[in-house]
């Protein structure tokens, strides 16, 4: 009886919105004597498994850092391969995601992304548009600082008096605001592969997120690792700068 109540209480403490910095693909591949692109391909398969498990756990939104504005500085061949991954991912896994009632969305600047990449994202979003389960949100060509700048520029163009700008008003113009009305900022942000930094991911939105740094490289991050991160979150005491 007590265990059932405890389990129910923990489920009620689920993070609604999880952000994931999928790190370690290249290092994982190097350890296996493989090229970096081998790690990116393995990471694609991990993403499907983690997304499905998150949806089944009852997570409402999962935002994954797929490609940052800084990633353009990587070798040309690697960038080209990464840009092909959405095409492969959606063609391979959209049927599974549809069956799991998962919605596909994207944030980030469309300008600069290859047409084939954008077409695959748009097609996946359209094919899952009638789903009402977890939102799987891909941050592509995304940077947190750039997100804030674009929001301010948009407000300035609309004639907004920026001297009266509030946090609430700015939040409404950030890219995550288009995902869902009244979308929560990330409750939990996970970074894999042992690195402990945010790397310009959801800079504004992560102000009060709980952070979880997993030692596991992204290609090895699975449903059990996600459960460990959620369990750690459930043990945190979130005070939002106050005192309890």
From Swiss-Prot:
Alphabetical list of InterPro entries matching this protein: UPP_synth-like (IPR001441), UPP_synth-like_CS (IPR018520), UPP_synth-like_sf (IPR036424)
Enzyme Commission number(s): 2.5.1.-
Enzyme type, top EC level: transferase
Cofactor entry: Mg(2+)
Domain of life according to the entry: Bacteria
An MF annotation (GO) of this entry: magnesium ion binding
NCBIfam families xref list: PRK14830.1, uppS
Subunit structure: Homodimer.
Name this polypeptide is given: Isoprenyl transferase
């Amino acid at each position: 009886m007590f265990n059932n109540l405890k389990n129910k209480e923990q489920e009620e403490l689920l993070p609604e919105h999880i952000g994931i910095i999928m790190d370690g693909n290249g290092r994982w591949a190097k350890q296996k004597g493989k090229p970096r692109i081998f790690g990116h391909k393995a990471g694609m398969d991990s993403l499907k498994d983690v997304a499905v498990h998150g949806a089944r756990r009852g997570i409402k939104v999962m935002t994954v850092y797929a490609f940052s504005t800084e990633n353009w500085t990587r070798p040309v061949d690697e960038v080209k391969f990464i840009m092909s991954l959405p095409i492969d991912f959606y063609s391979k896994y959209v049927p599974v995601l549809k069956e799991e009632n998962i919605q596909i969305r994207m944030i980030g600047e469309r300008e600069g992304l290859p047409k084939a990449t954008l077409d695959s994202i748009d097609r996946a979003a359209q094919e899952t548009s009638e789903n009402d389960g977890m939102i799987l949100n891909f941050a592509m060509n995304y940077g947190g600082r750039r997100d804030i700048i674009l929001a301010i520029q948009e407000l300035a163009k609309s004639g907004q008096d920026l001297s009266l700008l509030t946090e609430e008003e700015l939040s409404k113009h950030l890219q995550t605001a288009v995902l869902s009305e009244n979308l929560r900022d990330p409750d939990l942000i996970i970074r894999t592969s042992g690195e402990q930094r945010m790397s310009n991911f959801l800079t504004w939105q992560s102000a009060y997120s709980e952070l979880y740094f997993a030692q596991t490289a992204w290609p090895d991050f699975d449903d059990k690792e996600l459960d460990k991160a959620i369990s750690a979150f459930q043990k945190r005491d979130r005070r939002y700068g106050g005192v309890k």
